[in-house]
UniProtKB/Swiss-Prot annotation:
Keyword terms, alphabetized: Ribonucleoprotein, Ribosomal protein, RNA-binding, rRNA-binding
GO biological process, one term: translation
Keyword DNA-binding: no
Oligomeric form and interacting partners: Part of the 50S ribosomal subunit. Forms a cluster with proteins L3 and L19. In the 70S ribosome, L14 and L19 interact and together make contacts with the 16S rRNA in bridges B5 and B8.
Gene Ontology MF terms in the entry: large ribosomal subunit rRNA binding; structural constituent of ribosome
GO CC term (a single one): cytosolic large ribosomal subunit
UniProt source species: Geobacter metallireducens (strain ATCC 53774 / DSM 7210 / GS-15)
Keyword flag RNA-binding: yes
Entry protein name: Large ribosomal subunit protein uL14
HAMAP family: Ribosomal_uL14
Family: Belongs to the universal ribosomal protein uL14 family.
Functional note: Binds to 23S rRNA. Forms part of two intersubunit bridges in the 70S ribosome.
Length: 122
């Protein structure tokens, strides 16, 4: 569960290392974002000579949350960290690689490129 002012890790090679959530997209009074939701974030840490710079305002999709997510079969899944992937306005990832596992819920949200790049889908 991600809300405004949450610090997230970045799970791709776009160059950003930490993101700071500015806004959760989808509704005027929406407070929380879960797996597969899009947020607007500021880059708090970035590596030199990368596609995104420190201070850039980017869109990102949540791929892992520490808060458990219930599934239709009654099971739950949770991860060790809160992570996101930086995306462009066409909902495609800015980076070319995804690090770590991602949740199966991304497939239902039509983020096929992220699912195909991920080393493991849980």
């Amino acid at each position: 569960m991600i809300q405004m002012q949450t610090i997230l890790d970045v799970a791709d090679n776009s160059g950003a290392r930490k993101l700071f959530c500015i806004k959760v997209l989808g509704g005027s009074k929406r407070k929380y974002a879960g797996i597969g939701d899009i947020i607007v974030a500021s880059v708090r840490e970035a590596i030199p000579n990368s596609k995104v710079k420190k201070g850039d305002v980017v869109k990102a999709v949540i791929v892992r949350t520490a808060k458990e997510v219930g599934r239709l079969d009654g099971s739950y899944i949770r991860f060790d960290d809160n992570s996101a992937v930086v995306i462009n306005n066409q909902r495609e990832p800015v980076g070319t690689r995804i690090f770590g596992p991602v949740a199966r819920e991304l497939r239902a949200r039509k983020f096929m490129k992220i699912v195909s790049l991920a080393p493991e889908v849980l």
